[in-house]
From Swiss-Prot:
Bias type Basic residues, positions: 778-790
Residues modified as Phosphoserine: 146, 160, 212, 690-691, 695, 751-752, 765, 791, 812, 1383
Species, as recorded: Mus musculus
BP-aspect Gene Ontology terms: negative regulation of canonical NF-kappaB signal transduction; negative regulation of MAPK cascade; negative regulation of neuroinflammatory response; positive regulation of canonical Wnt signaling pathway; positive regulation of neural precursor cell proliferation; regulation of DNA-templated transcription
UniProt-listed InterPro entries: P-loop_NTPase, SBNO_Helicase_C_dom, SNO, SNO_AAA
Low complexity bias (residue ranges): 726-736, 814-837
Record keywords, A-Z: Acetylation, Coiled coil, Inflammatory response, Nucleus, Phosphoprotein, Wnt signaling pathway
Domain of life: Eukaryota
Compositional bias segments (type: Basic and acidic residues): 695-714
Subcellular location: Nucleus
Protein name, entry field: Protein strawberry notch homolog 1
Coiled-coil portions: 840-867
Amino acid sequence: MVEPGQDLLLAALSESGISPNDLFDVDGGDAGLATPTPPSVQQSVPLSALELGLETEAAVPVKQEPEPMSTPALLNVRQPPSTTTFVLNQINQLPTLGSTIVMTKTPPATTNRQTITLTKFIQTTANTRPSVSAPAVRNAMPAAPSKDQVQLKDLLKNNSLNELMKLKPPANIAQPVATAATDVSNGAVKKESSNKEVARIWINDMKMRSFSPTMKVPVVKEEDEPEEEDEEEMGHAETYAEYMPIKLKIGLRHPDAVVETSSLSSVTPPDVWYKTSISEETIDNGWLSALQLEAVTYAAQQHETFLPNGDRAGFLIGDGAGVGKGRTIAGIIYENYLLSRKRALWFSVSNDLKYDAERDLRDIGAKNILVHSLNKFKYGKISSKHNGSVKKGVIFATYSSLIGESQSGGKYKTRLKQLLHWCGDDFDGVIVFDECHKAKNLCPVGSSKPTKTGLAVLELQNKLPKARVVYASATGASEPRNMAYMNRLGIWGEGTPFREFSDFIQAVERRGVGAMEIVAMDMKLRGMYIARQLSFTGVTFKIEEVLLSQSYVKMYNKAVKLWVIARERFQQAADLIDAEQRMKKSMWGQFWSAHQRFFKYLCIASKVKRVVQLAREEIKNGKCVVIGLQSTGEARTLEALEEGGGELNDFVSTAKGVLQSLIEKHFPAPDRKKLYSLLGIDLTAPSNNSSPRDSPCKENKIKKRKGEEITREAKKARKVGGLTGSSSDDSGSESVSDNDESDYESSKNMSSGDDDDFNPFRDESSEDNEDDPWLIRKDHKKSKDKKKKKSIDPDSIQSALLASGLGSKRPSFSSAPVISPASNSAPANSNSNSNSSLVTSQDAVERAQQMKKDLLDKLEKLAEDLPPNTLDELIDELGGPENVAEMTGRKGRVVSNDDGSISYESRSELDVPVEILNITEKQRFMDGDKNIAIISEAASSGISLQADRRAKNQRRRVHMTLELPWSADRAIQQFGRTHRSNQVTAPEYVFLISELAGEQRFASIVAKRLEGLGALTHGDRRATESRDLSRFNFDNKYGRNALEIVMKSIVNLDSPMVSPPPDYPGEFFKDVRQGLIGVGLINVEDRSGILTLDKDYNNIGKFLNRILGMEVHQQNALFQYFADTLTAVVQNAKKSGRYDMGILDLGSGDEKVRKSDVKKFLTPGYSTSGHVELYTISVERGMSWEEATKIWAELTGPDDGFYLSLQIRNNKKTAILVKEVNPKKKLFLIYRPNTGKQLKLEIYADLKKKYKKVVSDDALVHWLDQYNSSADTCTHAYWRGNCKKASLGLVCEIGLRCRTYYVLCGSVLSVWTKVEGVLASVSGTNVKMQIVRLRTEDGQRIVGLIIPANCVSPLVNLLSTSDQSQQLAVQQKQLWQQHHPQSITNLSNL
């Protein structure tokens, strides 16, 4: 029975998502060691845990009422608290622990407030270490309850929650009685944390914790107790499995080895009942391989079913690069064409891929299907005469062209209307969304709106409900947000567990890594998803470290200093001229975008010499080279060309250009004289014709929006106009411009909420070569969105300024030509006012002008050392354009002529138009005319450069990357250019990495992924070291959490979790603080000088980009500090049992996995009724004496063999078997009798402290004893004689040799909400959904959800008594059979 008032607290906590049952789990390290008799310890936990705004400095001892059984011992407390300690704990379980809740009223010296403490009693161990002498104080006499003690229920009745929180403690709390626990030599007592530490630990805990259903009892750790970390499930041995179609036996084998993730391979797809119409010739000649035919068949089969809302079901192809998605799609279109569905739509990311689409259709024997480009049609009916009367075939379009619109009006003035008319209302043909993850975000993050492209894709599907939709994306089901417009998969919506897409996203993202695996498996199970990847067997890679020369480091550090000065000047100038908020936002957006690109260019430039060297060597060895770049730096070249009047005297420094362009265009200092002379205005002449209405304009004439010259702007717009769509400069790792047609509207809509570095097209002025999208691409519809301008006399100067976006109606800089409402009613200023304002603003502007000039002068000095454009330098060093095939988005290049002069030339050739230049260059490379190819990321999507059996050039490809993306998925996508099906030889990959921040780490993460896919490293130099480096990927919640701790510790908001790098010369925190101020991640308050963190301070991407702007030794030390903190965060999470390991692997190591029971349940589904199975699995992980002696017999090292612990506990010793695995570092592998092979390696020095070497006979008794008892006795009971958890009737599995798991498999998605309901009701809302992969002894693979033991019976009841769902499933099955009479024979085994 809940006492009155308790419901207040419970409600408050449940709102915070905290389960009262689990509020204060005590970690093993936190409990003090107590007296030899089993006492109960009182522990108070600080209120800051509840994030209720109060702070505390120590735990508070509380008097307790006498108990019949045990004697209390108090926890050691060093100092009285400064604030209320208020602990809510296990209200409904307290009586079972024999505890009493008391409130002490202490006579206060300075205050009349009450002290409230709610405590929890914890029983601790009965055994002290033998080395500790018996304590002098055996027991502290418990005080009888005094008059001052008040029961909690009375307290809760009389106070509101708010009042309880305000109560202050008295100043004079007595020191607690000392016990053996105060003996520091014990090593088990944790030091009191400071209030900041406690707050941090609790806040992080709340973020990460998974609440367990049962009360956790503390494990008291002794100093020398061997750590038995239960990490057995961490083995991720086999991630990928060989793939062959299971249910379909037609077609020839695929030319290359293909793999599938092992979780997907554990699921079998549905039976095939659909018969394809594709000709025997196509199949027998292998034009479509067996696995491509399988995808075509399943897609066609899925298209025969309808979702509950009446739409036709869609199919998702998740094949990776090189498996032949193009041919599979062509096969689906061909299949439907043969069935008289002769119209199809194919959307992709680049117009160049149209040629690939034509090739794929031709290759499978569908020569008669024509492919038309949407952008080549005029607006109007596609089937009309002026569009060539196109009645059938495939219309190929890019996503961005979907939102195209004609200014001339008419019935079909948008591309979408054209397509809808061409298809017709009853359209049941194929719509393919290729690379659909690139179609801009429909499900935006934060405050931004969905993009027009995303909405158009959705509208197209909604308007054509009978269309056969195919989604194709290599990252299809790995990123749930990318699935926003895959509404035809039937995962969310009517008749599914998730009503809306947002419900699905919440459920999946809340459940972590494994949830998407469950979704993918469920989709494969239902026949709507297929995902294979090319095996990387045969591929080799090496990591080539490029050492930075002293002169390079010097130059880099100079550049860093210049950027720090630039940041200060930009800030000062903006303050001087009182820049408007919107202008500042735009300015900083541009500043950080330029900052990121500048340092990326410097990083790449450091590797050019080495690349050239390696490339020449490989060519000599008879191989050919592909060099991958992210960006081309074209915009910089064009600017330099214009400044030199079309003449160049040297290669252009891209890095210099970035900073120069930033200062010239975006420094807040208008060049007034130039502007007015250009407009023909005499500043000194008084304006005669200005009416009172216009007088405010006088002072404003002087102001303009940004310091650009209007004519130069217009001139440049004309000049650069043709380059708008090019992917030239900003295909950087976070750029939005993935598409060949940059979708300005969409990009402006994207994440408008904040100025992060990643979107160069965000702010009012666009990037680089698109100086102003409005000037280049006049888009009349956009002007409708702008606020209505106040009518202005067209002859006035102001209107000229406004028209060119340079005027403003306010005496401050406006970043956009929008007039604020305030200016409409502004009173006319008097002349004197106007003049004085003119003088001060002129003075400020002149000072800003001077700053701008100084910055440009400093840049010129530095420019002598800055490296030239990487791409031009590479081409020049490797023999010029005649030897190098360039596949990038740029239109021209800088070349050195025979006479040594430098000139700019267009890339286009006489007989080759610019549009197909890249395809021509690719052909030259594939034909062997050129043996070196340089590709930029944007231009290369979909281009195949492998050593194809059909190509003339069959030399082995060596693919070099100068810039690794820090996401392994993106890297694998890049490598898909040279590693594809039907190749003679697999490529070699070379990662060039410098010693700049974290490049080594990126490389090792990518290397680890490649190894998982079957690639080999050159030599074994990396075998041990880099595995440690890549052990934890950092773009996850632990990475963000570690970064938060790092940043807070640097500004003293938090105490550091790890010590700074020992080899750092100087004061680490002080230097790094200055460095981070310089890159804008720490802000300094103007007046107070207080340091504050940037609002995105825990954004990993931003952090990694920004720290490149710190001096070399600083950024490396900071990255090392971050990596160390991350390791500590992960270790802590593991120790507290809250580490989200993603997917657990059982049975891939030495464990023996057996199925002991299985229960099946029918579940409803829209196409077929599915079923779920609940397996009872027993896992045996120990090592018998026979197995141990077998390993022992093979050991050769001097220190290998059996060891016994020096310490005796409960009259027992620990026996272990030790094997040396790394002689250089003296690392040893340990085997234990109860838990088998340990994942954690031990250093020899640590081993010697705890163990001594013995002969095998001495170890035998101890080994057998622990092996036999661990079958059913946990570690605590074995070493201490009792286990507190077991004594409370709870299950304890720590150290058990045999464990039991309950795993729910099958169509889990259809019962997801039921499972969540049961888990939440038993275990609280934040229970972690743990996915497990099992491989049983008989070779069966099982992947599913672990169900906690205490949730099994309610779940079984729910699933089995759900008669309604079973009946519904049977009805659906019958209905389905009526729709598909031809398939009844095939359904008997469904």
